[in-house]
């Protein structure tokens, strides 16, 4: 749901709260108000995160660490995409193409891979990715070393399947961020369902209260009075 539509829903709830007098109605509207405010906050955080990711992509991916012999740097910056047959992970490491071939090692399992780059500018670099979203073919997976880049090729066990995420953990985190109601429906449907349930379950006084608050809020909006 677009942020603008969420803001309109929030304003509508605030108008109804001003008019409602029944405790049950106010409690339901207050709960709906909190849900909408939380979703607006999540939308803003997602926008900020996307901006931060765009800025990170413009920076060198190699992690900078003090030059200490034997020190291992954990790789956290990478990019990935996919084809019908492979999931491809790109790791940028300055000068990696100049180290001996045997210094770049990748170990694959059906649901993970482990990259270790030894002795690159006095440090080692490690990247471990567990719980891949789907199984891969260990025998069909490989790595390539290009200029300043390590390319890891994970062969999909089932070809022509799409990976929406790289790992199962990432998928679960994204699904937890989804709102509890269907965001593909009409923007006001969540609020309307709450009011409809209260109306259907309420007595005559409650129905009159909701009807009065609804009519007055509509009249107020029609006149352009949007003070909240």
Swiss-Prot record:
Phosphorylated on serine residues. Phosphorylated upon induction by RA or at high calcium concentrations. Component of some large E3 complex at least composed of UBE2D1, SIAH1, CACYBP/SIP, SKP1, APC and TBL1X. Interacts directly with SIAH1, SIAH2 and SKP1. Interacts with protein of the S100 family S100A1, S100A6, S100B, S100P and S100A12 in a calcium-dependent manner. PROSITE patterns: CS, SGS. Residues 73-167 form the CS domain. It is found in: Nucleus; Cytoplasm. GO terms for biological process: heart development. Disulfide bonds: none annotated. Residues 73-228 are annotated as: Interaction with SKP1. One of its GO terms (molecular function) is tubulin binding. Residues 2-80 are annotated as: Interaction with SIAH1. The modification N-acetylalanine is found at residue 2. The lineage of its organism: Eukaryota, Metazoa, Chordata, Craniata, Vertebrata. GO terms for cellular component: cytoplasm; nucleus. SUPFAM superfamilies: Calcyclin-binding protein-like (SSF140106), HSP20-like chaperones (SSF49764). This is Calcyclin-binding protein. May be involved in calcium-dependent ubiquitination and subsequent proteasomal degradation of target proteins. Probably serves as a molecular bridge in ubiquitin E3 complexes. Participates in the ubiquitin-mediated degradation of beta-catenin (CTNNB1). It comes from the Eukaryota. It holds the Pfam family Siah-Interact_N. Keywords: Acetylation, Cytoplasm, Nucleus, Phosphoprotein, Ubl conjugation pathway. InterPro entries: CacyBP_N, Calcyclin-binding_UBL-bridge, CS_CacyBP, CS_dom, HSP20-like_chaperone, SGS_dom, Siah-Interact_N.
């Amino acid at each position: 749901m677009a942020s603008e539509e969420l803001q309109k829903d929030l304003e509508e709830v605030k108008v109804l709260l001003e008019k409602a007098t029944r405790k049950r109605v106010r409690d339901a509207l207050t709960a709906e108000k909190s849900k909408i405010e939380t979703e607006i906050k999540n939308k803003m955080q997602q926008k900020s995160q996307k901006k931060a990711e765009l800025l990170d992509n413009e920076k060198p991916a190699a992690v900078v660490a003090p030059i200490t012999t034997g020190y291992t740097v954990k790789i956290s910056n990478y990019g990935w995409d996919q084809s019908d047959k492979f999931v491809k992970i790109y790791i940028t490491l300055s000068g990696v193409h100049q180290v001996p071939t045997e210094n770049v090692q990748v170990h694959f399992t059906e649901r993970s891979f482990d990259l270790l780059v030894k002795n690159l500018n006095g440090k080692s670099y490690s990247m471990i990715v567990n719980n891949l979203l789907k199984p891969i073919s260990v025998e069909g997976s490989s790595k390539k070393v290009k200029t300043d880049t390590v390319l890891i090729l994970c062969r999909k066990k089932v070809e022509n399947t799409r990976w929406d995420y790289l790992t199962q953990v990432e998928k679960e985190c994204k699904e937890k961020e989804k709102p509890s109601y269907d965001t593909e429906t009409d923007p006001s449907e969540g609020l309307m369902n709450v009011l409809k349930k209260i109306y259907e379950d309420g007595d005559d006084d409650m129905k009159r209260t909701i009807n009065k608050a609804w009519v007055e809020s509509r009249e107020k909006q029609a006149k352009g009075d949007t003070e909240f």
